A protein has these predicted regions:
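Glycine-rich S-adenosyl-L-methionine
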Residues: 92-99, 161-173
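Surface-exposed amphipathic alpha-helices with a cationic face
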Residues: 106-109, 134-137, 168-178, 248, ...
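Auxiliary Fe-S-binding modules of radical SAM enzymes
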Residues: 169, 191-300
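Conserved strand-turn element in the central/C-terminal portion of the radical SAM core barrel
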Residues: 160, 173-193
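Hydrophobic faces of well-ordered beta-strands that scaffold small-molecule active sites
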Residues: 72-74, 117-119, 142-144, 181-185, ...
Length: 300
């Protein structure tokens, strides 16, 4: 059974590629997370061909972790469902890399090694994997990134992503197959009216949750006229005064936050020896308070 740890907490991440063809103007990954120029990051994608073997090894290695720590965010620093990358990988590896990764998680689950897989995307091509994800729906959450409901505005800042319509269609397809879908508007472009329009659209297609952060990290006007090779104009901590932070569910009402006590990895001090907390949980884990949001469902 999945336990709530926190809104944005994921102990593990999995990225099968380095680089991304989507070319989003607001992308935080090149130069900041991965030390590559934006031009290189957006034009050259490296595929980690050995990731299936490494993944099987790692999932078994950490199988004894507390269940609330066995959470993997899939596709954080790259878009998983880039069409050209998927085709190239299948041609050169002889199999579908995403399908293989999903199979590994599913097989581990069937053998008693249960993990939660959180799939992040802004591409409609995820619907190719609907049948496979549907059989894993007890252990999968899909999160679509959408910055605005308007196609023209979206295309201005997201050069090569799927259209809003195709993303909404994919949300509907996944939802109709019983798969949990959340929409993430981070960053979000627009005002409260745009926000209401977007939430209405995604909930009408079957999305079960929506989240937005109070912080809007970018000065949107700085993107006008930029190219993929231009340096990112980042305004750290810029507040979006039009919106509060939202974490809502379709048909649900958010109630008072509560705190729960769970085990989390210890933070290392400078020079302190690394402790593998999967092997030595008593040494590597500490009790910590994590804030969670709980919901009461209401019928409208």
């Amino acid at each position: 059974m999945q336990k709530k740890v926190g809104t944005f907490d994921f102990p593990f991440t999995l990225n099968p590629y380095i680089g991304c063809e989507m070319g989003c103007a607001y992308c935080f990954v090149p130069q900041i997370v991965i030390k590559k120029s934006r031009k290189d990051f957006f034009h050259n994608v490296e595929i980690k061909g050995n990731i299936p073997a490494l993944l099987e090894k790692e999932l078994k290695k950490y199988s004894n972790l507390p269940q609330h720590l066995k959470r993997v965010q899939f596709g954080v620093t790259t878009e998983l469902f880039q069409p050209k990358v998927l085709s190239y990988a299948k041609k050169n590896l002889g199999y579908d890399l995403i399908e293989k990764i999903l199979d590994i998680f599913y097989n581990e689950d069937q053998n008693g090694n249960h993990w939660m897989l959180h799939i992040l995307t802004k591409n409609h091509n995820i619907d190719r994997y609907t049948k496979q994800i549907a059989k894993m729906k007890h252990m999968v959450q899909v999160e679509f990134s959408i910055i605005h409901h308007d196609e023209i505005i979206s295309r201005q800042y997201e050069k090569y992503t799927s259209s809003i319509k195709r993303r909404l269609d994919a949300i509907e397809t996944l939802s109709q197959n019983g798969i949990f879908v959340r929409v993430m508007a981070m960053p979000f472009y627009g005002d409260l009216n745009d926000f209401s329009t977007l939430t209405g659209l995604v909930f009408s297609k079957g999305a079960q949750a929506f989240k937005n952060k109070l912080l809007n990290y970018y000065d949107w006007s700085s993107f006008d006229g930029t190219t993929l090779k231009d340096k990112l104009s980042r305004v750290t901590g810029k507040m979006n005064n039009n919106l509060a932070m939202f974490l809502i569910k379709s048909g649900g009402k958010m109630v008072r936050k509560s705190h729960v006590k769970v085990e989390m990895p210890k933070k290392r001090k400078r020079g302190e020896k690394f402790i593998n907390w999967a092997i030595h949980p008593k040494l590597g884990l500490r009790k910590d308070f994590r804030r969670t949001c709980r919901f009461r469902l209401q019928k409208y």
